């Protein structure tokens, strides 16, 4: 929903027109508690952008540990934060990932904490001890559990802790 643009000088810029319309439409329909922004870590690690120099859409293939990934996402997060602050939406916005591995999550957390340390981050996925205290919103699948001490620590910090339940294994 956010259009990523590569400028002729190699810098990144972004258009929020579609994103804004979607967020406003959802708010008009009562869905306005959080804005969950997916995903810094897509399945194939390809990022679509419009290349202003060629006038064509292209893909940047950048694994989460690469300098290209860090450059793109640093620019993205800083721009997105500014935009969300201007709209008054930053405090309810969360950068979210779905079912990603520990290495990719740690890479994404590192970029986010360096670029925009006050941006909230969430994961719906497997349990990783290393992420328990890093994520604002942590939603575990139905076969994963936090320890009692981890749950209490998250509760005391005001972090969101959820469980996703799927019954597909009962078929």
Predicted features and spans:
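Conserved small/polar residues in nucleotide/adenosyl-binding loops
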Residues: 168-169
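Glycine-enriched alpha-helix->loop->beta-strand junction motifs that scaffold or abut catalytic
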Residues: 116, 134-138, 156-161
């Amino acid at each position: 929903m956010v259009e990523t643009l590569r400028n002729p000088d190699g810098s990144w810029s972004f258009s929020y027109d579609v994103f804004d319309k979607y967020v406003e439409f959802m708010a008009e329909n009562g869905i306005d508690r959080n804005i969950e922004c997916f995903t810094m870590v897509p399945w194939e690690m390809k990022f679509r952008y419009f290349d202003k120099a060629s006038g064509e859409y292209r893909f940047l293939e950048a694994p989460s540990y690469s300098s290209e990934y860090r450059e793109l996402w640093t620019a993205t997060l800083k721009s997105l934060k500014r935009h969300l602050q201007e709209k008054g939406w930053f405090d309810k916005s969360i950068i979210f990932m779905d079912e990603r591995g520990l290495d990719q999550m740690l890479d994404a957390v590192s970029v986010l904490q360096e670029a925009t340390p006050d941006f909230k981050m969430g994961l719906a996925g497997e349990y990783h001890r290393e992420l328990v205290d890093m994520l604002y919103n942590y939603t575990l699948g139905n076969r994963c559990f936090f320890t009692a001490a981890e749950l209490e620590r998250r509760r005391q910090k005001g972090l969101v802790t959820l469980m996703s339940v799927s019954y597909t294994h009962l078929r």
